Amino acid sequence: MGGSASSQLDEGKCAYIRGKTEASIKNFSPYYSRQYSVAFCNHVRSEVEQQRDLTSQFLKTKPPLEPGTVLYEAELSQFAEDIRKWKDRYIVIKNDFAVESYESKEAYQRGAVPKSRILPAGGKVLTSEEEYSLLSDKHFPDPTASSEKNSQPFVLLPKAFPVYLWQPYLRHGYFCFHEAAEQQKFSALLNDCIRHLNHDYMKQTTFEAQAFLEAVQFFRQEKGHYGSWEMTTGDEVQVLSKLVMEELLPTLQTDLLPKLKGKKNDRKRAWFGLLEEAYNLVQHQVSEGLNALKEECRALTKDLEGTIRSDMDQIVTSKNFLTGKIRAMVAQPAEQCCGESVQPFLASILEELMGPVSSGFSEVRALFEKEVDELSQSFHATQDSAQLKEGLQQLMKLPLDSVKMEPCYTKVTLLPERLLDLQSRFRFPHVDLVVQRTQNYMQELMENAVFTFEQLLSPYLQGEASRIPVAIEKVKLRVLKQYDYDSSTIRKKIFQEALIQITLPTVQKALASTCKPELQKYEQFIFADHTNMIHVENVYEEILYEILLDETLKVITEAAILKKHNLFEDNMALPSESVSSLTDLKTAMGSNQASPARRVSAILPGAPDNELPSNEVFQEPEEKKEQPGVPGSLAISASSCPSGGDGQVSVDHSAGGPLTVENTAGPLSSHLSEVEAGGTLKDEEPTCQSPEPSAVPGSLKELKKLLTVTVSVESAPVVENDIHNGTPVPQENIKEEESKIHPEASHPAAIQQDSCEEREVREKEAQPLEAEAPGVDLGILPEGRGSTSQSTSGGLTENTSCPGPIEEPFEAQEPAEKVLPAIVSTEDSPQAGGEAEHSVTVTPQEDATLSSNPICPMESNEVAQASGDQEVLGGEDSSALGMDTEQVNDTHEHACQWLVEDTLSTDILAVHDFDVSSPEQPSEEW
């Protein structure tokens, strides 16, 4: 420190500074003690009620860096203020964001104490002498130097590319570089350090941090200062020290500035040195006083904890009652103030906020996609797995690459220009704080994106090299979808915080003279034992916040409904928790974690080329639900099958809903409701269950010989494949099969008898049959009178061209009944009028298990995307009747016949030939 400054800050001034600091801490203590008790009570309440943060997030949260991680190290020129000379120093910046200066690299490596250590909280980075001179003159209120011009710069530069670090109440830092690239890298990293040091403390969720910030707010309100404060940066010692310096500064300027002698640069240097010495004195005393104050508060809350926990219900009830009383007094003037001074401007402020903020997040997305594409192209050219892993490690460092991230941050720096009117209308000059918070969120989201990408891709790096580029592309698309949702969530949070931060001071100041004086009379509603945990000022502020929050959420929700800047609505069918399960990349064989739609698409001959089989990494079980243009896959659940008698099966193709089947054959409907109540059926397959009739004791054997399902559709004749034998079925066989079917109506007596026998069999828990019909195609031929139509909601209407693959419902945890497997063969028979009767013969087998994966080929633009988590069909609402039903009359006593008429029109009807065994699960690699 220079001699001039040392001579001015004598012992008398030091004593004065200590006295003012002690008085400030004493005045601040009651505010901090009150807020400490309130925050501790809220903390205990949250712990007791087990409150959770319901903020939804898709991307995995990147773990914090290990302490001591080096972000930057290089040798450069630094101006040594003590000797006023430029020296070559070895600069190291770790993830505590302190700038450490060492004599040399060897000194750093052997663990020497740094020559200087700078925490640049509240600082500003400049790269030109002109910018620095303007800023430093602004904070040097010297009346005698108003007309004086500097003949030389404040610091002579040894190199062409300087970096100036301006700091409030501290001496400034000066660095110099040979090349512009080095200057850009260092200045960008310094900006990162400043952003984190400014806001990382305020992001803490500890009740002590919340208590301190609330205490600072109430302390400043008592002096007539509302809203944010540009000095609320750094940790609690730095913030409180700046609060004291704010009171000291006028006195120091009056007493010391006139005594400074010399040229302007000399006086300026002396003034900055004087401020630094005063600030160090204040900071030391504040640190001691704040630690003592914390110990007192901790002792107080330790005594209160028992009361808080035992009286929690009473405390909550008392606070709610007090809130109602104060709200009745505040609501009318607060709403009037909002309606006149805030609400008319919220939409325009939001519009100005959305542009730069959304542009910044879009730039982050584009940067991530660009880096991943370069990684993929590099591997495609070299096929070098080692180089790919190295590139992946570099990708993980992308959020810390200040040079690459700087163009993203620059997009948001346009915000102060867009919000110039706020300074006059709402007196909000601190838009820079909003910019810095937004930039921190952008960096955090990039960290989550690259971390999620690395987690999802890592399992595939050991696989075949030819599949890695496809895996990279799939994982990239998956992460980008997650990024879009998380970006929308974070941006809405930024908008909400900014709108309240900008407009709340206006409401607070408007009501301060009318409502605040009335608060004292409401203290009578607080029990004496609870006066430490409930304060009327806090309740009053919460009410104002909630009123304003409602107004801000209205305009944000409206913007989301209008899809402005790709904002998503809050009521979308998305998970409320982070998709952390994506680390479980391996799906066990037979597991139901994988989407049924994905398993179907893995064996679809007509599936799109880009739909490669995969595990959970490529599935979108939740996001698909939010896409209105993607129809859900249809699934059919056969609940029961009558053994003789009239049976009616209805198939519902209502728009946007699942395909349900309901048997309405008299007493058998009770059996249907049983299965529906039980959820999904065993092995995710449609099951045909038939009770054992008493008319023929050997009915099970008879059913093994023949169990027929008849599907009546309007179509032209098509060639079907025998699923069991894997060979086409000639027309002669179709006619023979038709001869086995008796379309005549059965007698009512037989129905009644079968119903009685069915109840007897259920009571004995007889083992029914299970018919698993693979490859049964419910797509139909086009009708001459109908045309393809598809509902805008993404579901399929009654005349949809193709219902898409009929999807297997998920396996029930507790199947209602155990069933025997069966082998099913399908046949078509032409009928008059252009109808084709599609029959399915189900032959029970002991060891055969068949899957039901009907396939419907469609045009590429008509392929219905399968949703990830499908509802169990037929088990939700037994009243969902099919839209097209037809009676099935059968005189055969032991045949189970379904007649399903589907009037959906398609170009062709095709049944693909599959193995009898269950569909092969995707490999662990895919």
From Swiss-Prot:
Factors inducing expression: By endoplasmic reticulum stress-inducing agents such as tunicamycin and thapsigargin in liver, kidney and cerebrum.
Annotated family: Belongs to the Niban family.
Gene designation: Niban1
Record-listed Phosphoserine modification sites: S578, S581, S595, S601, S640, S699, S755, S923
Deletion phenotype: No obvious phenotypic abnormalities but mice show increased phosphorylation of Eif2a and decreased phosphorylation of Eif4ebp1 and Rps6kb1.
Protein name as catalogued: Protein Niban 1
Biased composition annotated in UniProt, kind: Low complexity: 784-797
One GO cellular component term: plasma membrane
Localization per record: Cytoplasm; Membrane
Keyword Membrane recorded: yes
Record key words, sorted: Cytoplasm, Lipoprotein, Membrane, Myristate, Phosphoprotein, Stress response, Translation regulation
Compositionally biased spans, kind Basic and acidic residues: 733-745, 756-767
Additional remarks: 'Niban' means 'second' in Japanese.
UniProt xrefs under InterPro entries: Niban-like
Biological process, per Gene Ontology: negative regulation of protein phosphorylation; positive regulation of protein phosphorylation; positive regulation of translation; response to endoplasmic reticulum stress
Positions of N-myristoyl glycine lipidation: G2
Membrane-protein topology: Lipid-anchor
Chain intervals for the UniProt region annotation (Disordered): 604-699, 719-889
Superkingdom of origin: Eukaryota
Species for this entry: Mus musculus (Mouse)
General function of this protein: Regulates phosphorylation of a number of proteins involved in translation regulation including EIF2A, EIF4EBP1 and RPS6KB1. May be involved in the endoplasmic reticulum stress response.
Compositional bias per record (Polar residues), positions renumbered to this chain: 661-672, 840-854
